[in-house]
């Protein structure tokens, strides 16, 4: 008893009082309160320990960032997010995709030749009437007839489109901005100066504007049946011109069912 009085007092006297109260309770009640207290302590530990770990990690990252403000890539590797190898691999794959943009720009100045067979929806139309509609369409497009044989050949000059030039410039700007963003992370020595490469994007529009002018040939052959009715119209030429002719003359491609688009006006 003397030893207990000489010993230093506890820092939390209420804990000692609680222990005394618990010991004075019945056995079952005492066991229930001890179990409850252990559960509360376990939950508290589960909450406090992760918070302390996160707090210490945040402090370490902040101190490291103050010492190395320009090394975002190294910081990410140090914190276990990504490795240098993964960043360089991603950069390599992204750079490889850039030639796809160059391919798009080159294809924009070249025509895609297609050959399609159409049928007339209105069976009451005479072949001469359909031929007049075809001639009127290509005449308005500044095409001239160069051959009046069995296959009629129309020749015209394609001019560049301002909308197409603007679209190519915009797509190139977005692509180069993405490349600049990747380079600022991978090679931070140049900082935001990498974004100056977007100044090259207007070159895409200039390239298209200078190369888009070209001559086009459209060949049309009308197949007339034994009863004097028009059976088929075979058209060969630039896919854009062929599609515009199909829409204006309300033709259907043979063996195909045409479904109007959501934003296409009904005639």
Curated annotation (Swiss-Prot):
It is found in: Plastid, Chloroplast thylakoid membrane. Residues 45-84, 186 are lumenal. The chain crosses the membrane at residues 85-105, 165-185, 187-207. The keyword Plastid applies. It comes from Arabidopsis thaliana (Mouse-ear cress). The gene is CCB1. Pfam families: CCB1. It comes from the Eukaryota. PANTHER family: PROTEIN COFACTOR ASSEMBLY OF COMPLEX C SUBUNIT B CCB1, CHLOROPLASTIC (PTHR35302:SF1), PTHR35302. One of its GO terms (biological process) is cytochrome b6f complex assembly. It is a multi-pass membrane protein. This is Protein COFACTOR ASSEMBLY OF COMPLEX C SUBUNIT B CCB1, chloroplastic. Keywords: Chloroplast, Membrane, Plastid, Thylakoid, Transit peptide, Transmembrane, Transmembrane helix. One of its GO terms (cellular component) is chloroplast. Residues 1-44 form a transit peptide.
